[in-house]
Amino acid sequence: MDSPTILEREFTTFRPPSGEIESVKIFQREDGKWFLRLAVSWKGGIACDVCLYDKPKLKLYSSIVSAVRHVCSTYEYAGRIILFPNRGRPIK
């Protein structure tokens, strides 16, 4: 992981009162799994890879549908989501 990381609890349970998710990018890895990279207002808009709720391990999704659903329902994000599929991998 080249990007800084952020624990999921930092923008769900412990999100600052005026904190906002500024952008969402979803990347596909070589193994076909998907992960999130979010930019949040309280970290100066720096894009961070999302880790598990309480562990610094990358949170992975088996399908793009589950990743998008999680962003929209759990994080209450209603903006643009940019997808970065891995060339040569099927999108599922």
Predicted regions mapped to residue ranges:
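Negatively charged, low-complexity tracts enriched in Asp/Glu with abundant Ser/Thr
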Residues: 1-19
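Short N-terminal micro-motifs specific to bacterial/archaeal maturation
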Residues: 2, 57-58
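Phenylalanine-focused residue identity feature
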Residues: 11-14, 27, 35, 84
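A short linear hydrophobic-aromatic micro-motif
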Residues: 22-25
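Short aromatic-glycine-(Arg/Gly/Cys) micro-motifs in beta-strand/loop hairpins
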Residues: 27-56, 77
